[in-house]
Amino acid sequence: MRVAGRITDAALASHDGRIVFVGPTAECDWLISPAPSATVIDATGCAVVPGFVDAHTHVVFAGDRRHELARRLAGATYAEISAEGGGILSTVRATRAATVDELVDVTRPRLDEMLRAGTTTAEAKSGYGLTLESELTMLRAIRRLDQEHPIDLAPTFMGAHEVPAEYRDRREAYVAHVINDMIPEVAREGLAEWCDVFCERGVFTPEESLSILEAGQNAGLKPRIHANELGPTGGASVAARLHARSADHLVFVDDEEAAALADAGVVATLLPAAAFYLKLGRFAPARRLIDLDVPVALATDVNPGGGFSPSLPFVMSLACFAMGLTLEEALIGTTINAAFALDRSEDVGSLEVGKRCDAVVVNGPAIELLRAGVSAIRAVVKNGRQAA
């Protein structure tokens, strides 16, 4: 989608969490009679946009790697930090030691931050357990949080996030473990909608990624993939071959791969904050992807190591000023396209009658959202109720 509708002097009304009216205020005044108990938000002078949809997060984890940021700023590489015991495997150790209750408790404040920044729906991945039981623990925590927190969560199984240390010299056995043990149990318990793989040099090859995602598809888990983040590693081609709903990162994607993504109907979910914090020196070619008719979504990639911001407005600012998107394209990327990337566009992502009443009230015109470092959000509405 490329064009966002706009109504001036507008009103929005909901009942039982669903939008029942959106249109000119004059029409609302004679069509809708608010109940005495109704909450009324005066948005005079404000833009009201759909609640943001964050289509790629690693928000559930235990442990703390903020100290690695200082090492990185001092010039240490990710490989050097990993060799010192840091990186993903540091988070794995902490997450394996955590219970469902502990993961819920440490994640809830992160979701609160996301909500205050306007996010009302988000994807949440496992992938810091890397054993059957700890991956299930993460997904059970995600299910609990989805039930208890205002943000709706789309659960993704990502046992193929990294090869754990105990399998380092027998990676084929770990791939088989993911396919033969993890995926069937995740599907049996109904803990995930999606299956994701980190297809990257030194992690999972395109062939391994294809096998894992096909196994997920056969078990009822829809495919998405981390692709071409650190180099041209073939993940985008895997996404196109499988008609995956989303290929994420795509910092190193060429025109041939982009055309294949467009032909296959794959959403390019771009994560400019990840490229920014990892100091990659380049961003995904968002403008080129849009010109080649690839639908573009934007997400935070909030995670313990290289995604320190839970704010989609910050991501929008990067997308506009570092990747060449217009404000309208950035809004579409964080709303309806992101909802489509999560297979939720029939329910959220736009302000339409019948959809969930998820909305963000901006303290001024929508361009205020691009003011990085300050919050331009006056109110966040989730299911028709003010949630932040």
Please tell me what each predicted stretch does.
Residues M1-P34:
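N-terminal metal-binding scaffold of metallo-dependent hydrolase/deaminase domains
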Residues M1-V3, T334-I336, V353-A388:
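C-terminal cap of metal-dependent C-N hydrolases
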Residues L12, G17, G45, H56, ...:
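Divalent metal-coordination and catalytic microenvironments
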Residues A35, T39-V106:
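Metal-associated gating/positioning segment near the N- to mid-region
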Residues L89-R108, D112, T120-T233:
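Metal-coordinating catalytic core of metallo-dependent amide/deamination hydrolases
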Residues A117, E189-G190, A219, L242, ...:
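Structural motif
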Residues K222-P223, P232-D347, V362-L369, Q386-A388:
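Active-site-adjacent C-terminal substructures of enzyme catalytic domains
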